[in-house]
């Protein structure tokens, strides 16, 4: 799932491997509060050991089929077979998931899934819909492939993995699990084009640019131009050296600034028809860019969810009522 909590766990666990003290690895889950006792069973498939308990028996069988389907897709794109069997630990709901003792701490409420590096275990709760569960399984399995390809958890751990930026790692997981067309990411890109805030390559690591959305958009461009074979090739190269820019330039035979400039151009070109249809003027020079950045939100339209006098209120995931 797209949460900063899971990102920290993803990379933080990898960094623990190089730490001098093994305490964090030895005492996984010692501070997790457990209100229930889960009696896990194991469902074995061709590539997975799926851990589940009684009340999620039927859902676990569905998740196992999803996982095998994702394995076939990802292994084909990345040209890689995982070393050994892949553990997949399922919880029936999020409150159960928060009691897991697999991790060093309890996952937060916004965490949709975790892939830890020490044993390459995927841990996740069943989602509110089959689509959500399917997406999270795919996203987390891609992280398992990233670990395996770069050697995390083994003695030959890729020396540069801890220097690979989040937009590269999480963007790849989003691109391969959602695809190149995503309304959510498209919304982010259109807004950035409208405000003239397309980042330079070096700025992609800034917290200002959410790694999931910007990373997915960049990978969608790379896959569209160079084909998906470049995804695994870039991962292997960057994993060996920790130098994403160098890997990009070697694989494409082009300077990274040229790649990013064409990516920006493609974002603008894809936004122009929508801007024309909605009467939005896209900025074309520095003055217009600055004006767009300073544009108050109210000029874009009337407030629909927060009225006058309620400036301290906010809405999370609002939805239209079916009955009006």
Language model feature labels by segment:
Residues 50, 74, 167-183, 190-257:
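Active-site-proximal alpha-helical
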Residues 25-165, 182-184, 202-204, 244-247:
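Juxtacatalytic substrate-recognition/specificity segment
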Residues 12-13, 22-23, 177:
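Cleavable N-terminal signal peptides
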Residues 150-152, 189, 278-279:
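Short coil/turn segments at secondary-structure boundaries
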Residues 1-10:
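Bacterial N-terminal signal peptides that target proteins for export
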Residues 18-20:
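N-terminal signal peptide c-region/cleavage motif recognized by signal peptidases
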Residues 27-44, 206-210, 233-324:
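Beta/coil-rich, acidic/histidine-enriched accessory regions frequently appended to metallopeptidases
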